[in-house]
Amino acid sequence: MGRAFEYRRAAKEKRWDKMSKVFPKLAKAITLAAKDGGGDPDTNAKLRTAILNAKAQNMPKDNIDAAIKRASSKEGNLSETTYEGKANFGVLIIMECMTDNPTRTVANLKSYFNKTQGASIVPNGSLEFMFNRKSVFECLKNEVENLKLSLEDLEFALIDYGLEELEEVGDKIIIRGDYNSFKLLNEGFESLKLPILKASLQRIATTPIELNDEQMELTEKLLDKIEDDDDVVALYTNIE
């Protein structure tokens, strides 16, 4: 996804924050991580990352603690599911969900697509090969400087931990690696004592497409409906 789409997503995330829409999504990630690996972030890297991402969005500590406790209750009966869809203008969509009711989730997603002319849900696996899965970490540039490291030093230090690409974006450093290197890269940051601002597993289109303003406006109507669904925790497209 290109910068135009990322700017739109950034604006959307700000609206989520104002409406407290983002907190339920973050809470689900915390609950599922705690359910899978236990409620101690010191021994559960997945939970540690989920908490890190929640703190990056200013999620209150009480909300985080409640989400961890929820893992041992009936409310913690969550599962991860992925759905794929197509829209007009060659747009491909992958939706990652966390839900306690997959039947409800797929019914809601189908309704968004059915109400959008030319859009449809497709069988899982139809589009996955058109996206590469990557580990993506963000840290602050000044945190790197505080460790007396240059960007070259950082790149060299993390290569053995699976780094494939390092990019400077404003006051942040973006680190990308293979999907399977997520745990290893996390260990690399810990070995350097470099604080992670945000960490995620992302899907990046192998052949991105460009849309004009009119096409983007029409496509956004569907994407906004998907993003606003509490069960959808990540949305990926092939839009440049």
Swiss-Prot record:
Gene3D superfamilies: 1.10.10.200, 3.30.70.980. This is Probable transcriptional regulatory protein Hac_0344. One of its GO terms (cellular component) is cytosol. Belongs to the TACO1 family. The keyword Transcription regulation applies. Signal peptide: none annotated. GO terms for biological process: regulation of DNA-templated transcription. GO terms for molecular function: DNA binding. InterPro entries: Integrase-like_N (IPR017856), TACO1_YebC-like_2nd/3rd_dom (IPR048300), TACO1_YebC_N (IPR049083), Transcrip_reg_TACO1-like (IPR002876), Transcrip_reg_TACO1-like_dom3 (IPR026564), YebC-like (IPR029072). It holds the Pfam family TACO1_YebC_N. NCBIfam families: PRK12378.1, YebC/PmpR family DNA-binding transcriptional regulator. Its main location: cytoplasm. Keywords: Cytoplasm, DNA-binding, Transcription, Transcription regulation. It comes from Helicobacter acinonychis (strain Sheeba). The keyword Transcription regulation applies. It is found in: Cytoplasm. HAMAP family: Transcrip_reg_TACO1 (MF_00693).
